[in-house]
Amino acid sequence: MAFFYNEKHSLHYLVRGRGDPLVLIHGLGGSGADWAFQVAALERRFRVIIPDLPGSGHSPPPRDEYTIAGFASALWSLLDHLGVPRTNIIGFSMGGAVALEMAAQRPACVPRLGLINSLATYRPDDWRKWLEVHVSALLVRLLGMRRAAWLLALRLFPEPWQRAIREHAAAVVGAVPASSYLGMGLALARWAIIDRLDSLTSRVLMIAAEHDFTPLAEKRALASLLKADIVVVRGSRHGTPFDSVEATNASLLALLTDQPLPPQARWVRDPPARARRLSLAGSIAEEHAMARVLSRAPR
């Protein structure tokens, strides 16, 4: 395993493939391994850099408080260490907040930015966000991480044919220390970039699930402010990179290769037949060779 150290953070990361650099940033409660469904498609054309954010995966908690700006600075320090002055960035959920913050910190260094089910502010400024923040924290404190993670996984992947994905998500999130999960959640609830969007110069693609936690209208408004393209994935919930792999990968490749977006009418949640194969395989790792893709020594 490869680690980067500085005075504030110790970051675990993986590097796959060759080509223009591309950073993939996971969401709250996840790790770099969450990108297993995307890496195989992306590493053929790009040098894919996959960090575990502080307090996630194999990365220990930060030495000071959790902040989105601190995460972004830590990733830029990692990229400086790797000799990467300029990179495309894809962020999922909280990872999208970190990606936006990175683009704001060094606007000229992020030519393309992909945001999956992400917003420009997570401050609890309406009742939905307030409820998400407080109920999530309350469940963790009352039930502990493992039980709270199972409820979250059930909400993300409720269909019977999503059993393998649901069990994997519950195991990954349930292994996160409660203090780390709550610290990252608080950092997200305190973060906003809405008043700094004018500083961004990246070409932006937003991928939005039809049934995400937060309203689609808010994402459409953000896309308008960013002059971004937006792909709406019908039938998908918050875990779009998991439940709509084909739509996610094709859309990201269109952004990264400056190609037109595919016809959006075809993008629906991956069909049950495909997901049933996941369940029969017994685990996501077997079906998509997660171990082969993400557990090799860095090249």
PLM feature spans:
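Flexible "cap/lid" loop of the alpha/beta hydrolase fold
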Residues: 104-105, 111-141
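Alpha/beta-hydrolase fold catalytic core
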Residues: 1-22, 44-46, 85, 253-299
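Conserved alpha/beta-hydrolase "acid-adjacent" motif
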Residues: 213-219
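Short beta-strand/loop motif that positions the catalytic acidic residue
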Residues: 200, 206-208
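Conserved HGGG/HGGXW glycine-rich cap/lid loop of the alpha/beta-hydrolase fold
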Residues: 9-60
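Conserved alpha/beta-hydrolase catalytic His-Asp/Glu region
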Residues: 124-129, 143-199
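Active-site loop/oxyanion-hole signature of alpha/beta-hydrolase fold enzymes
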Residues: 40, 49-90
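Catalytic histidine-centered segment of alpha/beta-hydrolase-like enzymes
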Residues: 236-249, 265-268
